[in-house]
């Protein structure tokens, strides 16, 4: 692959704006933590139990207390906690679904390492076992300047586009397409991430999320122009 472009809509970018070199995606690691304790009768023999639910709860609080990094933004979130089997049973199992993020790969790795320490510490505190399983990851985005300039030149010709800019100073999430971008660039290709602005009824991942469908036509025409007008014989 010589040229690669990923696209998104929204993310706080206003309608009529196309960001042709989005570089604010955070590196991220997604993982599950499986806690295994010992079940016991909660009324008759509670001392025989090793409470996986309490270990997971302690880990959750510790994860959200990880210190920030001086070199950039970081994030951690426990999105799911599942535990236990019955109200009269000391919980023998618990599951946490966790993600870490960082403005760079280094910062994300720092948060991830601290997260592993917190989880292991909570497991030790309650005398339970824990296993973490990697579920996904992405790197930070670093668009290729020449490709960004070409995308800007094409987006600027599309009706409904008020401005085609290189980047924005705004927070974003993470994006697995960054791994494909990095792979293309490692093989001397060029890559970028384009965000098409649109009005949103509610933020991303909100149950009331909706968008103005005019952005779809703008995106399709931009991508069409990018391919149809490209100087294939000489490249850029």
How does the language model describe each region?
Residues 53-236:
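Metal-dependent amide/peptide-bond hydrolase catalytic core
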Residues 1-76, 80, 85-89:
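Histidine/acidic-residue-rich, glycine-tolerant segments that coordinate divalent metal ions
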